[in-house]
């Protein structure tokens, strides 16, 4: 998960989003009352976290984990998302997987993704930051329920508008 640890990576980047720190008030204000799709839902932890703020109208994952449809996020179309205002997910962090996902998701709906904060400083992510309209800082998160430790990396919610282009000024919201 982290570049500063030597732990083995979990298959398919399955890191459940159960930590309430992943949903700061500034993020909740952005999504309150909206209907959304969670296309990398895993066991539904993020949907549970957002239950009081927004309404999940589509849940799916590429692997059956007891929640939502068994469905590849890269196969989503506007048809599956017709009842959704936006996409919210904690996607896999493998670059060759997530970068095409960003392109695909923003071609369908406005999108919020929980990603490592330092990605915004990397060249490979530059074209995505050029299109990113908002970044909300989250800080360090806990990925393992039985562990007393949080991650060694910081995280952010990144927002892209529907069909975002590279003429966007990014608004940054720190931890308040």
Segments predicted by a language model, with ranges:
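Class I S-adenosyl-L-methionine-dependent methyltransferase catalytic core
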Residues: 1-176
């Amino acid at each position: 998960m982290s570049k500063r640890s030597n732990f083995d990576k979990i298959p398919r980047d399955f890191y459940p989003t159960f930590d309430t720190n992943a949903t700061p008030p500034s993020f909740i204000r952005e999504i309150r009352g909206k209907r959304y799709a969670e296309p990398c839902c895993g066991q539904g932890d993020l949907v549970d976290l957002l239950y009081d703020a927004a309404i999940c109208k589509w849940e799916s994952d590429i692997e059956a984990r007891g929640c939502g449809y068994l469905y590849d996020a890269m196969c989503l179309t506007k048809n599956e998302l017709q009842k959704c205002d936006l996409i919210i997910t904690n996607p896999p962090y493998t670059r060759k997987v997530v970068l095409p996902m960003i392109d695909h998701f923003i071609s369908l709906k406005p999108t919020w993704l929980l990603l490592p904060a330092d990605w915004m400083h990397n060249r490979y992510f530059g074209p995505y930051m050029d299109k990113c309209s908002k970044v909300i800082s989250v800080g360090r998160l806990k990925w393992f329920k039985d562990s007393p430790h949080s991650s060694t990396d910081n995280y952010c919610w990144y927002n892209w508008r529907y069909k975002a282009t590279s003429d966007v000024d990014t608004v940054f919201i720190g931890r308040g």
